[in-house]
Amino acid sequence: MGMDLTNYVEVRDHKTGEWKIAPVQVETVHYEAEHMDKPCCLTKIVYEYDYAQPWYGRNSELFSILEGGNYNSILSYSRGLPSDVSKEVYDFHEQFKNEDFDGYWSYGESYLTLAELSSALTDRKKYPKWIKYRDEFGSKIKEHGSYWDLKDFVDAIRYFTNLVPGVYDSNDVRVVFWFDC
């Protein structure tokens, strides 16, 4: 069992000051090894998003940075959902509490602005940047250093923000996230 990171990018409306989910239509392609011991056998997986979700799935390094644990520094302790969270993100979060969602549950609800995340990237010493290999549960797992995982996360948020019409300051862009299993 593992924890997935559920996350959505929100932008602040310049006219009303309200936060809204970043509405984008995007298709991403991800290649995944069918068998961890045979990385040559890759399967093409296409994800389609109606809303900006900069990260899909599990990543223990990013989890440690966002929620704490292991050896990493934590960016911020859980703040809960923002009081002014967009209706769409609030509704998505409520689905995880619904019994019809097959018993999924969430924890570690929080949010960070693009400014906060970008600032964290300036201090590379906090985050190991080497690539590690380790054997765990009989399979080979390749983990990228946590600095690069954070950088990829921030780059994805910037990418999605650029798809939204308008110009946004880094304090007017945030990612709202939680963990679920």
Whereabouts are the PLM-identified features?
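Acidic (Asp/Glu-rich) sequence patches and key acidic residues
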Residues: 1-173, 180-181
